[in-house]
């Protein structure tokens, strides 16, 4: 199945029927042993991607399972649900952006979600590059080895996001981050990318509404909300514009009134001098 046809299939299924299918997969996973659970989730993903992309995803899953024995890449209790909980959850981000996207940055890539999954799909696009930023050297080593094994078009940047973002932002079309930070902090981290014109694609769990409310206290946002196919309570925030809100007069002085003119408000002595 080619990229265009898989995109159409996802569009035909989303959002309600895909959510039902993913929920059913999740319930089956909880009752099955590890091998059958992984196969069940894999079958659901296989309907949405090409054979070549599926082969790359298989390699990613194999590498993660092997490295997970020595490095905590994902929560251990989510490993039996790998294809649904992590791969499908990451895959859905690709369908929310234009098919012309070639340059994608994933921050705090950790166990490779969504970055490695995005790269597995974008590998079918000539000239595509996915930049994975991960400061943990062991996790960066995993990302590098998984990318090599699956022949992914990635660049691994083993640096802190704060150090790398200004240098990497130019030319990026999409920036993503999964389970990295609450939205207000996430906007701070991704600001260079958003200001450079990148689309921010951020999956959020059941607290998405509270995070969005908190973020809007300090930011003016243009965004679209999409239901998650992997989490019935979650949403994916697709942010097209983010600007810091102008501080109020009170906030400029830390919430205290200005000291200008304070002397004139004090009582004066008979000689007109302030005590």
Curated annotation (Swiss-Prot):
S-adenosyl-L-methionine binds at residues 108, 113, 161-162, 178. The keyword Coiled coil does not apply. InterPro entries: rRNA_ssu_MeTfrase_G (IPR003682), SAM-dependent_MTases_sf (IPR029063). Residues 250-261 have a biased composition (Polar residues). The keyword Transferase applies. Its main location: cytoplasm. It is found in: Cytoplasm. GO terms for cellular component: cytosol. Keywords: Cytoplasm, Methyltransferase, rRNA processing, S-adenosyl-L-methionine, Transferase. It catalyses: guanosine(527) in 16S rRNA + S-adenosyl-L-methionine = N(7)-methylguanosine(527) in 16S rRNA + S-adenosyl-L-homocysteine. Its EC number is 2.1.1.170. Gene3D superfamilies: Vaccinia Virus protein VP39. One of its GO terms (molecular function) is rRNA (guanine-N7-)-methyltransferase activity. Residues 247-275 are annotated as: Disordered. Specifically methylates the N7 position of guanine in position 527 of 16S rRNA. Belongs to the methyltransferase superfamily. RNA methyltransferase RsmG family. This is Ribosomal RNA small subunit methyltransferase G. It comes from Azorhizobium caulinodans (strain ATCC 43989 / DSM 5975 / JCM 20966 / LMG 6465 / NBRC 14845 / NCIMB 13405 / ORS 571). The gene is rsmG.
């Amino acid at each position: 199945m080619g990229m265009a046809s898989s995109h159409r299939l996802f569009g035909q299924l989303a959002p309600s029927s895909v959510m039902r299918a993913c929920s059913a997969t999740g319930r089956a996973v909880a009752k099955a042993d590890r091998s059958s659970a992984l196969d069940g989730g894999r079958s659901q993903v296989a309907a949405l991607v090409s054979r070549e992309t599926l082969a790359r995803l298989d390699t990613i899953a194999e590498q993660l399972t092997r490295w997970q024995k020595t490095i905590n890449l994902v929560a251990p209790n989510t490993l039996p649900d790998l294809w649904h909980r992590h791969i499908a959850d990451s895959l859905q981000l690709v369908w929310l952006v234009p098919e012309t996207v070639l340059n994608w940055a994933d921050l705090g890539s950790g166990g490779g979600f969504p970055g490695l999954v995005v790269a597995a799909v974008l590998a079918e696009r000539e000239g595509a590059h996915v930049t994975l930023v991960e400061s943990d050297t062991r996790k960066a080593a995993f990302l590098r080895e998984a990318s090599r094994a699956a022949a992914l078009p990635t660049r691994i940047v083993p640096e802190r996001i704060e150090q790398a973002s200004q240098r990497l932002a130019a030319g990026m079309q999409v920036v993503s981050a999964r389970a990295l930070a609450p939205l207000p902090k996430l906007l701070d981290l991704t600001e260079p990318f958003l200001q450079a014109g990148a689309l921010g694609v951020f999956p959020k769990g059941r607290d998405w509404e509270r995070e969005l409310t908190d973020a809007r206290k300090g930011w003016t946002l243009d965004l679209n909300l999409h239901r998650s196919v992997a989490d019935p309570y979650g949403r994916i925030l697709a942010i097209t514009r983010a600007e810091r809100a102008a501080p109020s007069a009170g906030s400029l002085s830390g919430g205290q009134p200005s000291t200008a003119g304070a002397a004139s408000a004090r009582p004066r002595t008979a000689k007109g001098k302030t005590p």
